[in-house]
């Protein structure tokens, strides 16, 4: 079993394409979305669970310790270039089951104090190929829109207009939690979980 190189992992982050699309910095023309964010925050609902008992507010050391324990159990492995953690979602997955195997890469987002303030994820079908029309990223995002409601219950995902037809996006707001995902290319869907109180200074 390949063991995680946590020392090296601590120096790298998942490459995340930061698109020039609106929901990373809301503008006045998106007032409906802004109202939604504020209304959900006003409910007082708090969501700290991220994945595998990793939670908002934990330290970077906590993150590495939990990943190490999961790796020893054979539940996760080292991602490409040791820049992330790899978890394979299949029909027996406790995260959510999928008949088509899905590779999920994830890595914590940390603030200046090295506390967890979010999570980055990247999904792709394990059997993806350019000619496999049923395993493209648009199919995957549609599947994730429903399957992710199991580990992250609450409101449904809604379409978010990025003004970029090549990178359609969806977003889900529950209390102080925002989950947004977008199509990176024909293979990958990227996702980020964040705290709206921190993100938008609410």
Q: Which residues make up each language-model segment?
A:
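Sec-dependent N-terminal signal peptides
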Residues: 15-23
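Post-signal-peptide N-terminal segment of Sec-exported extracytoplasmic proteins
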Residues: 49-85
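Long, charged/polar, surface-exposed segments that mediate recognition or autoinhibition
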Residues: 96-164
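An acidic-aromatic pocket/loop used at catalytic or ligand-binding sites
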Residues: 102, 121-124, 171-202
């Amino acid at each position: 079993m390949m063991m995680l190189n946590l020392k090296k992992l601590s120096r790298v982050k998942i490459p995340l394409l930061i698109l020039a699309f609106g929901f990373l910095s809301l503008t006045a023309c998106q007032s409906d979305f802004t109202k939604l964010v504020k209304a959900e925050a006003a409910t007082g609902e708090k969501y700290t669970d991220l994945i595998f008992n990793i939670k908002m507010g934990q330290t970077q050391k906590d993150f590495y310790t939990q990943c190490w324990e999961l790796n020893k159990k054979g539940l996760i492995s080292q991602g490409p270039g040791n820049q992330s953690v790899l978890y394979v979602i299949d029909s027996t997955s406790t995260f959510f089951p999928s008949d088509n195997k899905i590779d999920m890469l994830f890595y914590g987002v940390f603030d200046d104090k090295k506390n967890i303030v979010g999570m980055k994820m990247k999904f792709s079908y394990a059997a993806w190929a350019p000619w496999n029309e049923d395993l493209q990223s648009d199919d995957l995002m549609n599947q994730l829109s429903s399957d992710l409601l199991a580990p992250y219950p609450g409101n449904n995902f809604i379409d978010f207009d990025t003004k970029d037809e090549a990178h359609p996006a969806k977003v889900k707001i529950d209390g102080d939690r925002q989950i947004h995902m977008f199509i990176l290319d024909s293979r990958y869907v990227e996702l980020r979980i964040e705290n709206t109180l921190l993100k938008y200074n609410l």
